């Protein structure tokens, strides 16, 4: 499988690497990591990365995006990483490339690229890229190894989630054969400003229960604006405040935005992906997302989740 992907990459002198909007550690790690791999193994190629700002993961080396003029795409290859749907891809210019290639580990939603390499057995897209590098015997650079390891760590929940397998640790071990500082990665992931800690405390106090084992947070546009932070930080960043609560098997973070109600679903027990798909979203079995039209849709989703848990919704 990976030899075919390598053949596609070899065929183009100009390559632009895309990933999903509002990047997490896996999106950035796979993007930076693949770019570093290609640059070190094929120095004659012009490889660039594009997308919106790194946000919370700006500490990652190589996280500043490249300037790419529109005409660069003529005759170029666009690589799409860690993305299951076209509307999630950051920078729509991938459509103008001569050829497209996708690597992804999400549950399949739609065909996006001319050539696709997707495999849900990987805990992260970074794990998939690491396997690609290993099986095709590409030279691993310190930046590539560090970036890919970072994405594996973040998408596996520091190797805690069910998607973590022996394959995960084997690939992590493979990456660690190339010298880089693990302490720098964890310092970036765990170090928080006082304001961030206070923000989390504020959201802990907002946690409510829809049933015995289903928890949620709902944040209005006015409440979000009062925090002084962006909606993505609230939506993706605060869903974790409900994790590891005894007796809570499903938790959802709803955040009103200009584009609708952002929804982050998580579970320690159930496959909540079908619920996300029902509401136009997607993702993984136990970590998915969607954008809802309004608060009433959020209530409907909560009722569906309570039914999944076999409980009566108290809304």
Language-model-derived ranges and their functions:
Residues 18, 22, 80, 102-103, ...:
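Generic enzyme active-site microenvironment
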Residues 33-35, 95-98, 118-119, 170:
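Glycine-rich, phosphate-binding/catalytic loops in enzymes
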Residues 106-171:
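Short alpha-helices
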Residues 25-31, 87-89:
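Short glycine/serine/threonine-rich phosphate/pyrophosphate-binding segments
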Residues 21-23, 83-86, 106-108, 221-223, ...:
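Short glycine-rich anion-binding loops that position phosphate/pyrophosphate groups of nucleotides
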